[in-house]
């Protein structure tokens, strides 16, 4: 995992490096389906494809936990809507580029300090459920 956040899988705890002076909270979105134009082969460029995206967004949720106000946190409905709209009008040759694009978008637009982004193409090859890329980035 990345420097900014490591998960203790047996205990479900998150740890941070010395670069962050407090524990990091994570908002997650799993198995989001979105349409985008992706691929290098003519058959892939002929139509939009569905990709599956899972996100972990490292932000402090302390204010929202205290206030119970959506304005004090990342609104995941807004994340989903904006990502779907952005990706619907975009083309990427590689999953790596698409994944970087999403990570950068989250870091720049949602005050995230750390993100983990997983993007998969579905049913691309016989006998393979999905192929994909997972990255972690931080500010």
Please place each PLM-identified region on the residue numbering:
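N-terminal, polar/charged subdomain of small-to-medium soluble alpha/beta proteins
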Residues: 5-139
């Amino acid at each position: 995992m990345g420097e900014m956040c490591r998960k203790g899988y047996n205990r479900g705890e998150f740890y941070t490096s010395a670069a962050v002076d407090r524990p990091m909270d994570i908002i997650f979105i799993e198995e989001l389906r979105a349409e985008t134009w992706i691929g290098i082969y003519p058959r892939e460029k002929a139509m939009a494809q569905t990709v599956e995206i899972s996100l972990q967004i490292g932000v402090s949720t302390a204010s929202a936990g205290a206030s119970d106000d959506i304005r004090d946190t990342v609104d995941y409905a807004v994340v989903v809507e904006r990502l779907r709209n952005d990706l619907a009008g975009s083309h990427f040759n590689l999953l790596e580029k698409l994944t970087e694009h999403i990570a950068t978008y989250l870091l720049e637009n949602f005050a995230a300090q750390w993100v983990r982004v997983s993007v998969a193409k579905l049913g691309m090859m016989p006998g393979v459920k999905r192929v994909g890329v997972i990255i972690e980035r931080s500010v």
